[in-house]
Amino acid sequence: MNLNATLIGQLIAFALFVWFCMKFVWPPIINAIETRQSQIANALASAEAAKKEQADTKNLVEQELSAAKVQAQEILDAANKRRNEVLDEVKAEAEELKAKIIAQGYAEVEAERKRVQEELRLKVASLAVAGAEKIVGRSIDEAANNDIIDKLVAEL
């Protein structure tokens, strides 16, 4: 019965091997596996947190971008409104200036017309006196001459 003694010896050797493995080999392996599981779980949790944070950040960026677009549109609208107001003001000022220049031109023309008319009256009066002197054949004194001219100017 050698087979039984060998079998018992192998059984004892196997039991010692299992005990040795359970005592010295398995704990570091189990610790390494548990550590690795913990690291993987932490990495997955971090990845989920990062994914959630990225989604939140993306939403925040989209909201900020929308707000910036709205604000930019408001600024553009305000600028366009101000531009139109300035254009209207400039047009009104230009119209006022145009009317003022035209009125000033008319006033200058009227003043020049009156000056020329007065000058013409004086020349006509002088010519009339000169003609009258020639007709009468004598010279009228200066005071009488001015008096006649003033009367003619008043009549004209």
Swiss-Prot record:
The chain crosses the membrane at residues 11-31. Pfam families: ATP-synt_B. GO terms for cellular component: plasma membrane; proton-transporting ATP synthase complex. InterPro entries: ATP_synth_B-like_membr_sf, ATP_synth_b/b'su_bac/chlpt, ATP_synth_F0_bsu_bac, ATP_synthase_B_chain. It comes from the Bacteria. Keywords: ATP synthesis, Cell inner membrane, Cell membrane, CF(0), Hydrogen ion transport, Ion transport, Membrane, Transmembrane, Transmembrane helix, Transport. It is a single-pass membrane protein. It is found in: Cell inner membrane. Its main location: membrane. One of its GO terms (molecular function) is proton-transporting ATP synthase activity, rotational mechanism. F-type ATPases have 2 components, F(1) - the catalytic core - and F(0) - the membrane proton channel. F(1) has five subunits: alpha(3), beta(3), gamma(1), delta(1), epsilon(1). F(0) has three main subunits: a(1), b(2) and c(10-14). The alpha and beta chains form an alternating ring which encloses part of the gamma chain. F(1) is attached to F(0) by a central stalk formed by the gamma and epsilon chains, while a peripheral stalk is formed by the delta and b chains. Belongs to the ATPase B chain family. F(1)F(0) ATP synthase produces ATP from ADP in the presence of a proton or sodium gradient. F-type ATPases consist of two structural domains, F(1) containing the extramembraneous catalytic core and F(0) containing the membrane proton channel, linked together by a central stalk and a peripheral stalk. During catalysis, ATP synthesis in the catalytic domain of F(1) is coupled via a rotary mechanism of the central stalk subunits to proton translocation. Component of the F(0) channel, it forms part of the peripheral stalk, linking F(1) to F(0). This is ATP synthase subunit b. It comes from Haemophilus influenzae (strain PittGG).
